[in-house]
Amino acid sequence: MATIGYIRVSTIDQNIDLQRNALTSANCDRIFEDRISGKIANRPGLKRALKYVNKGDTLVVWKLDRLGRSVKNLVALISELHERGAHFHSLTDSIDTSSAMGRFFFHVMSALAEMERELIVERTLAGLAAARAQGRLGGRPRAINKHEQEQISRLLEKGHPRQQLAIIFGIGVSTLYRYFPASRIKKRMN
């Protein structure tokens, strides 16, 4: 049962001594480090630390925000450790998932992360509904407006080639096929 430390500083200029001293005092057998922003998901030091952790081991950080910036990421990382039979310990936040209280705190964090996701979905849906009520549509603007659609439809019915119409209207041939499938034009011509 090893104790693995993880250090992260956001910039090369930041000093890691405070974190290293704390992890050394916590009797970490091995310490991994990153000098990279917590917003960056791809952290080589953290990846090596997680590979090194085995069942019964504990991953130790000086402070919770050294491991991740969002509750969602923290929950995912700690869940991964839990699934592998490993523990997590944050020294300054007094979180230790090897204890009942630490596991309870982790479950509260998980619930908060889920609630945060649900609130984001609710706000997004409410915003889209409000925009629709004001006549705004979401998504990319249409490539061609109604008037242009009517013009193109008439020209296609007269037999003008799609490639030529695409150049004239400044759109792709695939856009023309999306608006005017070949089967629809043939039906109109018959």
Swiss-Prot record:
The active site is at 10 (o-(5'-phospho-dna)-serine intermediate). CDD domains: HTH_Hin_like, SR_ResInv. One of its GO terms (biological process) is DNA recombination. A DNA fragment of approximately 900 base pairs, adjacent to the fljB (H2) gene, which specifies the synthesis of phase-2 flagellin, can exist in either orientation with respect to fljB. The orientation of the inversion region controls expression of fljB. The hin gene occupies about two-thirds of the inversion region; it is required for the inversion of the fljB controlling region. It comes from the Bacteria. Belongs to the site-specific recombinase resolvase family. Residues 162-181 bind DNA. Keywords: DNA integration, DNA invertase, DNA recombination, DNA-binding. InterPro entries: Homeodomain-like_sf, Recombinase_CS, Resolv_N, Resolvase-like_N_sf, Resolvase_HTH_dom, SSR_resolvase. It comes from Salmonella typhimurium (strain LT2 / SGSC1412 / ATCC 700720). SMART domains: Resolvase. Disulfide bonds: none annotated. Transmembrane segments: none annotated. GO terms for molecular function: DNA binding; DNA strand exchange activity. PROSITE patterns: RECOMBINASES_1, RECOMBINASES_2, RECOMBINASES_3. Residues 2-135 form the Resolvase/invertase-type recombinase catalytic domain. This is DNA-invertase hin.
